[in-house]
Regions:
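Membrane-helix interface "capping/anchor" motifs
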Residues: 15-29
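Flexible, small-/acidic-enriched active-site or ligand-binding loops
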Residues: 330-356
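Extended amphipathic alpha-helical segments enriched in small hydrophobics
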Residues: 384-451
């Protein structure tokens, strides 16, 4: 009986200490008291046991915890040796990885990883707030664009974006939502951009792509944040009005997000441009999977820059650099379109060999040479939180709307399938995903709207919202059965 009581005391004490997140010294005291209680014989009224060698061994946990309660001793005996061992096993952090880790800002994610989040900080983030102009754009041009879209025509009959859609998007400034009003753009908040993109995504994933890409990671945002005054005054108004259609070329045959393996190379040298000798870069590159590439008039290019003669004064290996190149510049080749899973948005390769460009075509000019990866990571910290999460959330909400309605009207054995447990379970998952995605989208967009660049949260949002959408689509197709796989203008799941 005494053994059972002692075990209950041990379990109760450990649970209490764990739930209270007690410090190490408290655990040492508890273990010491329990050991003393167990050896004293007080639980069963017997006399204390003799001090044999086994009784001394019982005090070892108390001694170990007591020693580990001293921070300096714990660090020298355990933390430092373990850290040194782990450091020899893990691969070294590359320069590009370090820049990615340092990019952006730390917000509520720090609270989450602290283990004791202050939920008041989360509640202090303001709710969805749109200006009158943003709300009017959402209710006006955005609604008109959605009404114009015939998704079956886009993805099946034409297999490309109709020109009237392109004209409407350009005319109404959809391509310049993030460009400031000072430079001819709409200057909308991230929250407004998220809602606008989500509404378009509910009608067509192809159409939202041509709006989303210029308003996420692309020349527009890079020029707005890092461009020279000349680049801002020349390109931003043209991008905002749709006179220039941009693409950004990062992915190649050997590299995607891993810029360290990039084989697109540029060498600083003097050359001739428009009959004049000037300092510039001779480029050779090969890119693929570039969205808007076949339609682009302005190519943003990421490459690794070398300066053998140190003409820029930054050493031989300058680093990842970003440049703006007109698509009709001599030597620039735009390849045939890819067909990514039957999608109709323009996507394709581009390449060039020994293409000379002036040094001032580098985004930000000569001084920003070698800073390209940091520039990309800073922009991605915000862009990842808006574009894909908004379209993924809209997709899930669309799945919920049509699937819940279908499950209510579709009957089997005299009952709506929505009342069958095998359908209820995936339907509940879709409902949960819709609420979770929308809450996360709205909260993250609000963070970005107030000036944060949450790199960790945005990366998690990009992955989690799209993955949850994929699962919701699977559940929706399972519930619809054969109706989901028979394509046609009435198949709302594939639109």
């Amino acid at each position: 009986m005494a053994t059972v009581v002692l075990l209950l005391l041990v379990v109760g004490a450990f649970l209490a200490l764990g739930m209270a997140r007690a410090p190490m010294w408290a655990w040492a005291v508890a273990v010491g008291l329990l050991t003393l209680l167990g050896q004293s014989g007080a639980l069963d009224g017997a006399e204390a046991a003799g001090h044999g060698i086994l009784s001394w061994f019982a005090w070892l946990p108390f001694v170990a915890l007591s020693l580990l309660s001293i921070p300096s001793l714990r660090r020298s005996l355990i933390v430092a040796p373990v850290f040194d061992k782990v450091r020899t096993i893990l691969p070294k952090v590359s320069d590009t990885e370090a820049q990615a880790l340092e990019a952006g800002t730390v917000g509520f994610d720090a609270e989450i990883f602290s283990g004791t989040p202050d939920w008041n900080k989360l509640q202090s983030i303001p709710p969805i707030q749109l200006s009158a102009e943003e709300q009017a754009f959402l209710d006006g041009p955005t609604h008109q664009l959605c009404a114009m879209i015939n998704d079956w025509q886009v993805r099946h009959s034409l297999r490309e974006i109709p020109e009237d859609i392109w004209d409407f998007v350009k005319k109404n400034g959809f391509l310049g939502m993030l460009i400031s009003k000072e430079h001819g753009g709409l200057g909308f908040s991230p929250q407004a951009q998220s809602l606008i993109l989500g509404k378009i995504a509910s009608r067509s994933p192809d159409i939202v792509t041509i709006v989303m890409v210029p308003n996420s990671l692309g020349p527009g945002e890079l020029i707005e944040k890092y461009g020279t005054d000349a680049q801002k005054h020349h390109y931003l108004p043209r991008l905002a009005k749709g006179e220039e259609v941009p693409c950004f070329s990062l992915t190649g045959p050997t590299s995607g997000s891993d810029a360290a393996t990039m084989r697109d190379i540029g060498y600083v040298m003097r050359g001739t441009y428009q009959g004049n000798e000037t300092l510039g870069v001779r480029l050779s590159w090969e890119k693929r999977y570039i969205t808007l590439g076949p339609k682009a008039t302005l190519v943003g290019l990421a490459f690794r820059l070398f300066d053998k003669d140190n003409l820029l004064g930054k050493g031989e290996d300058v680093g990842i650099t970003l440049a703006l190149i007109p698509a009709d510049h001599p030597g620039v080749n735009i390849g045939r379109r890819h067909l990514p899973s039957g999608a109709a948005f323009p996507n394709g390769p581009n390449w060039g060999s020994d293409v000379f460009i002036p040094i001032d075509w580098i985004i930000g000019g000569e001084k920003m040479a070698g800073n390209g990866w940091r520039m990309l990571m800073e922009c991605l910290s915000a862009g990842r939180a808006i574009s894909l999460p908004s379209s993924a959330t809209a997709g899930v909400k669309m799945m919920l709307r049509v699937t819940s309605a279908y499950a209510r009207v579709r009957k089997q054995f005299g009952l709506p399938v929505s009342r069958m447990e095998g359908v209820e379970e995936p339907l509940v998952r879709i409902i949960e995903t819709a609420y979770v995605n929308e809450a996360a989208r709205a909260m993250t967009a609000a963070m970005v709207s107030r000036g944060e660049r949450p790199s960790v949260i945005s990366a998690l949002m990009k992955y989690q919202t799209t993955e949850k959408m994929r699962r919701a689509v699977n559940d929706a197709m399972d519930i619809h059965g054969g109706r989901a796989i028979c394509d046609g203008p009435s198949n709302y799941l594939q639109s």
